[in-house]
Amino acid sequence: MEKPIKPGRVTALACILMLLVIVFVVALYKLQIVDGKAYYEENRNSVASSQTVEAARGSSLDRYGHVLVSNTSCNNLVFNPDDLFEQDDPNGILLQMARTVAACGDTYVDELPVTAKPPFEYTDMNDTQRTQLKGFLKYAGLDEEATAVELMSYCREKFEINNNYSAADMRIIAGLRYSIKTRYIDKLYLPDYVFVQDASMELITSLKENNVPGFEVTVSYTRQYHTNLAAHLLGDTGKMNAEEYTTYKTQGYPMSATVGKDGAELAFEKYLHGTNGTAIVTKNASGTVTGTTYTKEPEPGDQVSLTIDLDLQAAAEQSLTRGIENMKSKSTETSDAVGGGALVAVDVATGQPLAIANYPTFDLQTLFQSQESYDAVKDAENEPLFNRALLGQYSPGSTFKPCTAIAGLTEGVITTGTRIQCTGTFRKYEDTGYAPKCWIASSGATHGNDNVTEAIRDSCNIFFYTVGDSLPIDTLARYAAAFGLGEHTGIELPESTGQMATEAVKKKVENTNWYVGDSLQAAIGQSYSLFTPLQLAEYCATIANGGTRHSASILKSVRSYDGSELIYENQAEVLSAVETSDYNWAAVQKGMYLVANDRAGSAYETFGDYGVKVAAKTGTAQLGDNQVNNAIFICYAPYDNPKVAVAVVVEHGSAGASIASIARDFLDAYFTVKTVDTAPESELSLLQ
């Protein structure tokens, strides 16, 4: 039996419904009648547009997760041409903006390559500025050879710049109008013009408080360097030029995209570059953003981990700097000649670079702060921007002798028991007028009757002249190539391949014939052989591990932006192998051990009492009359269980023995670092 509905409940329900209807009617009345006009005006003056949302670039880390490069967001000022040129005096507004920028201590991007004051002249231009100017001159109908004065005269007339403005103010206005105009010139492919990059809040507030029209504030990312180390490796980023755009546009890059310009930033662009998103942005009549709706979320770039160990990189740079500056400070006949240098350390088992140092170097954090700061580095003594470790090419000197030894042993020219008498002079071709001497002959001494191990210890030229005389130069070159000398190392950064001295190389360099003397000099690391410090380090690692040459890839791994997903992990890649017997390797390795541990060895003074047994070879690369020789040094350690191989080069360093202390200084740090935990507490904590 159904219960009867009580009259009180019906009344209450009716009252609630009536109240809801009244509220709805009042709200509708307010919306349509009271506020309707205001909403209409707001909607009529609102503008919705689809905008690109820049994706954050991925971070670069060292092998243990220390952050090397990441992002920081910044506010940029860009012009709104539609708004700007609706004003009565756009030129006056531009000048007002420029003055406000200066008053707030900010700087704006001035692209016009003309001096700030008369007499107007062109300033130095980079390739992008030159292309931009050429395109503008063509658009203006001016001759390519038009002077800066003619260009400024055209700008004053074209942009209707009042004659009441001073020449300096006219130049400011013309420069800004030039930057705006060139964005609309066909086929120039210029990125969007950013008036002020990383604008201060003082500047933004000042412009807004004074109701200055014609500009917008956008947010972008700039690279933040967390270290002043590895400047030649990390690289930098920037907006694309026209040539780069032709490459990247097929990959979906917008013209305004930031891309890697060199170093790891360029080499690993495909990982570091994120995918931009899009959003519908609504602005009111005053240009204030009133709403943002993402239609496609931006996808940040990936984390790239390099093989570099930040602690070892610091040690390498400090050791190299300390060693070279100490050499420069000594009052000797050769100290003034000491130039730049490089130190490279690689993992013996994998070939991975652990540290790549150059002297002199620079700081990426300050390099591009201004044109003046860049020019100061560019024009500094000994070319700090030059990556000697990868691009410098040096004769190896006696550090090449282990290669000659392996070639001679493997080809049967000598055995581990073969002894060759050092007489101070190689007399076989004396009747032709050619009789090269051993380095020790200048003191009236000889090395005696050396086997291959002792010859490496003594660096006896006569021994290696004899071996080289019995080896066809192409055979010796084949072994050099197997060691990676004169070959690509596999590193992803720009490098020189160098060259091994051969008949073909001499023909190319000097267009002259190959003589027996060339073969003898090539066997001791002179002649036309030129190798990079990175190649020498990998060569040393190949000796240490018994003949396996690995790629010098600098990429360790790639992870997703938040580190949660492993995208790529580098595996040691074998590029070539030097095949010979174990006892041949043992003989050569023992010879290098004696260089550092026998009193007759050239590196004994540095390593004789060292706590870790080191195998080494010194080299002196002769540069000709009246020039101080280059110093070359290679080593690996520990001798009985090789872990790290090191190559050091100092331009005009006189002799390899004189730079062995640089390698020892680095090894001190290496064996200290390896006894402690080098990883940060949390990889991801550094990226939050």
Describe these PLM feature segments.
Residues 1-272, 276-297, 333-334, 338-342, ...:
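Membrane-proximal periplasmic segments of bacterial cell-envelope enzymes
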Residues 69, 75, 283-296, 308, ...:
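Beta-lactam-recognizing serine transpeptidase/beta-lactamase-like catalytic domain environment
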Residues 91-95, 99, 201, 205, ...:
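Solvent-exposed, polar/charged alpha-helical surfaces in well-ordered, non-transmembrane soluble domains
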Residues 245, 273-276, 284-287, 317-325, ...:
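Amphipathic, well-packed alpha-helical segments that form the structural scaffold of globular domains
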Residues 289-341:
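Conserved, well-ordered alpha-helix/loop/beta-strand core segments that scaffold catalytic motifs
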Residues 544, 596, 664-675:
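Short amphipathic alpha-helical signal-transduction/dimerization elements
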Residues 650-653:
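Ligand-site clamp/hinge motif
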